Amino acid sequence: MLYLVGLGLADERDITVRGLEVVKKAERVYLEAYTAILLVDKAKLEAFYGRPVIEADRELVETGSDDILANADKVDVAFLVVGDPFGATTHTDLVLRARELGIESKVIPNASIMSGIGCTGLQLYNFGQTVSMVFFTETWKPSSYYDRVKENVQIGLHTLVLLDIKVKEQSLENMARGRLIYEPPRFMTVAQCAAQMLETEEERQEGVWGPDSLAVGAARVGAEDQKLVAGTLQELTQVDMGRPLHSLVLLGRRAHDLEKDYIRRFAVDEATFDAAWQNGKYGSS
């Protein structure tokens, strides 16, 4: 049996009781280590689980899935995923490959950023499509996310923006030369995301958002040192949210007064927040 086990958002204690039971009985335990990171290292997981954990990078999961699934028709294999197991399409692919091989699979769900973002006080049913923000380069600044956010904005819904992480990535030069040299890990910050959003708007010029649009930055959701900051996009380009992982929510104009009251506590500057709320006509249907 292949088990996909959600680990939750913060540390080794966030696994569910059912998930821990699976981990303890499995023949092999893999930790998916590239679509998201847990806020503790692998050694802490191993100490808590009382058994070794095999780190599964992008290459192993996407091209070596048969190695992960080896003998899973006879023994239990646990595949651990930060957040919820189906937070990335790669994990769906793994289940489909297991089906092709006649291997049964079972999912043990857990909290993910999609539900955890409720810690901002923004009501989950007021969210529209979720988008991803990748690191821009000098020659590559994709803006396809802009159109999805535009649809959310047009109907007044919040947008959760998931921020890029680069783990065990190669430079183009090293890839071209066939050298297995990896770049240092990089994790996008709320400040970088806000700056890139303003850069995209400057390029597109469709008025979907602007420097005075309100947003909420969230860091290390679910952890003891979770941090929330609310403000305009311009203000958020200057905030330091600390260590990863970060997310950003662009507020929709249908935001409720209860949501305003909740997030105002985290404002960079309450007077600026109040002015942006009023001038942006937030709270209107």
UniProtKB/Swiss-Prot annotation:
Pfam families, alphabetized: TP_methylase
Main localisation: cytoplasm
Pathway of action: Protein modification; peptidyl-diphthamide biosynthesis
Residues annotated as binding S-adenosyl-L-methionine: 9, 84, 87, 112-113, 163, 221, 246
Keywords: Cytoplasm, Methyltransferase, S-adenosyl-L-methionine, Transferase
Cellular compartments annotated: Cytoplasm
Gene Ontology MF annotations: diphthine methyl ester synthase activity
E.C. number: 2.1.1.314
Cited InterPro entries: 4pyrrol_Mease (IPR000878), 4pyrrol_Methylase_sf (IPR035996), 4pyrrole_Mease_sub1 (IPR014777), 4pyrrole_Mease_sub2 (IPR014776), Dphthn_synthase (IPR004551)
Family affiliation: Belongs to the diphthine synthase family.
Protein name (Swiss-Prot/TrEMBL): Diphthine methyl ester synthase
Organism encoding this protein: Emericella nidulans (strain FGSC A4 / ATCC 38163 / CBS 112.46 / NRRL 194 / M139)
Gene that specifies this protein: dph5
